[in-house]
Amino acid sequence: MTLVPIESFEHHIPEVHSSAFVHCAAHLIGQVQVGEEASIWPCAVLRADHGPIAIAARTSIQDGCVAHVTHDVSQTRIGMECTVGHRVVLHGCIVGDRCLVGMGSVLLDNAELGEWCFVAAGSLLTPNRKFPPRSFILGSPGRRVREVTAAEMEWITHSWKSYQDLARRYRRGS
């Protein structure tokens, strides 16, 4: 069995569902909750020392992501069946269910995504920006350029399911 780097902070210990996968090179600190069949990949850091971070069921937090919170200003909640791409920064934001956040994007304090949003790689969501469901978001600062298509919704579903399958393979030791 591989040990997972879980660190308590001021008596708060990360809670990881027994079916979740957390890579041994990830780091979870403080008030972190990881839901059923979620996956946290190498070099991801979820540092909940200023407030809670919640990762819902079947969501993947990919390599090099950083999640944090600004004390008394924001919270970080990621909905179910989301894909958070490599090197994304989640800083005090709320992501609805079935969203895809593209690689290298930055979501700042109190930014909110409705369900089925697609954030293009490298986008910057500035503080307090709120996006309705099915928004395709692009740029720096991020703006809604159109509605997410049915094909993109299929891709979002394919993405979280493929990471769920990969996590199962890692748990088996394949």
Stretches with model-predicted labels:
Residues 2-15, 74-89, 97, 136-174:
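C-terminal segments of enzyme domains that contribute to small-molecule binding surfaces
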Residues 18, 23-24, 29-30, 35-36, ...:
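Left-handed beta-helix
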